[in-house]
A protein has these predicted regions:
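Sliding clamp-binding short linear motifs
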Residues: 1-99, 174-188
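Single-stranded nucleic-acid-binding OB-fold domains
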Residues: 18, 76-189
């Protein structure tokens, strides 16, 4: 059906055709989007089907990423490409955290998951797993004093400042502050 074909086009299943998604949408609607007219037997002239000639329709990588986000709940490409404000910021690589044990650092990460907890004193705290730009994962602890000011609410890129700690040989970041980077505007609706 047309609906399923449009979903396949939107998910970039037809990349191999080297046609843009917009061109494929038009072709799909042209071929499947209307009902065939029943030819009357009394027509004087037989009309031929018109061929479809479209201008170059271009879509951007950001549009594709937002389509994927809408369809799957995540982008198939690098998650950092949908955000701004993190470029040019200092970020200590996870591979170097051993040099910064019990010291303050800044790291930039994409939220993989957040677990919200309530302490025995009825205060909120969070545990998080983030992905660094290189793809490496790191864990964070957000104690109540900082969690109340810097709640991680949704997936996105965060600039995290905190203290590197080691627990049973695994490094984690005890977060002091978390700044949420802005998402690029969706060009499909501009």
């Amino acid at each position: 059906t047309l609906e399923f074909l449009l979903l396949l086009i939107k998910s970039e299943a037809f990349r191999f055709t080297d046609k843009s998604k917009r061109s494929l949408f038009w072709e799909a609607h042209y071929l499947l989007g209307h009902k065939e007219k029943i030819e009357s037997t009394l027509s004087l002239f037989k009309s031929s089907k018109k061929s479809l000639k479209l201008p170059e329709l271009i879509s951007s990588e950001i549009e594709d990423a937002y389509d994927q986000l809408e369809l799957f709940g995540f982008s198939l490409g690098h998650p950092f490409r949908l955000f701004t404000e993190w470029q040019g910021q200092e970020s200590v690589s996870i591979k170097d955290w051993s040099k910064y044990l019990n010291n303050h650092i800044q790291v930039i990460g994409y939220v993989v998951t957040i677990k919200n907890n309530i302490t025995k004193h009825r205060q909120q705290m969070q545990f998080g797993t983030f992905q660094e730009f290189s793809g490496d994962l790191f864990d964070t602890v957000h104690f109540p004093m900082t969690s109340n000011k810097n709640i991680i609410r949704r997936n996105g890129i965060y600039i995290l400042k905190g203290i590197v700690k080691s627990d049973l040989g695994c490094f984690n970041l005890e977060v002091i502050s978390a700044y949420s980077c802005a998402r690029l505007p969706d060009p499909r609706y501009n």
